[in-house]
Curated annotation (Swiss-Prot):
Source taxonomy: Bacteria, Bacillati, Bacillota, Bacilli, Bacillales
Record note on disruption phenotype: Cells fail to secrete PGA into the medium.
Protein name stated in the entry: PGA biosynthesis protein CapC
Gene for this chain: capC
GO cellular component term, pick one: membrane
Function: Required for PGA (gamma-polyglutamic acid) biosynthesis.
Biological process, per Gene Ontology: capsule polysaccharide biosynthetic process
InterPro entries, A to Z: Capsule_biosynth_CapC
Amino acid sequence: MFGSDLYIALILGVLLSLIFAEKTGIVPAGLVVPGYLGLVFNQPVFILLVLLVSLLTYVIVKYGLSKFMILYGRRKFAAMLITGIVLKIAFDFLYPIVPFEIAEFRGIGIIVPGLIANTIQKQGLTITFGSTLLLSGATFAIMFVYYLI
């Protein structure tokens, strides 16, 4: 489900995210994240890995890096993105020794874990994960119906 499907899912995810944010005031981990995760929503191991790396990114920046650096605003956002990228690269190095489901993690947008982690620090874990999974599921469902037609 890539190529033009990726573009359709991203546009759909952005539109759903905008509508959701306008109606509820809750931002689902960046506008592009539900589109990316909607593409792989039928692979629970993959979704769990993305959420795990996002949580790990948040914990490393909040309780690790922020003890040694002054992080706020753009600096904190950059630290979240860079930490997420470094963790994803670490997963890429583990590729030969991990199961196939984890190897598929290599295909996800490299900034997705950082975007989710940044939203966790703003809105909290439950709200971020809940809204992101809700909109990713909605994106997946709409794409599924699109394929049936």
